[in-house]
């Protein structure tokens, strides 16, 4: 799972811009682009982005754990 790509995808779906997210986070546009490039990010940042975009990115990790457990032989 590449969280940066998933954040960008959600932004695109919502029609939000890099400038908009940068303002919401009080980050530079460069830092938002760096987030898009990251496979993982700090949980505090992910929590803020989840709140701003009104989307639970943490559920993607939970779902991934469930999928992993279902693929493990007993």
Q: What is each PLM-predicted segment?
A:
Residues 9, 34, 61-74:
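Short, charged recognition helix plus adjacent turn
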Residues 19, 30, 58:
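Key DNA-contact positions within bacterial/archaeal DNA-binding proteins
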């Amino acid at each position: 799972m590449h969280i940066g790509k998933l954040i960008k995808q959600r932004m695109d779906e919502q029609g939000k811009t890099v400038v908009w997210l940068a303002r919401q986070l009080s980050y530079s546009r460069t830092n938002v682009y760096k987030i898009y490039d990251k496979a993982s990010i700090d949980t505090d940042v992910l929590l803020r982005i989840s709140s701003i975009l009104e989307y639970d990115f943490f559920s993607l990790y939970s779902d991934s754990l469930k999928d992993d457990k279902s693929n493990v032989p007993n």
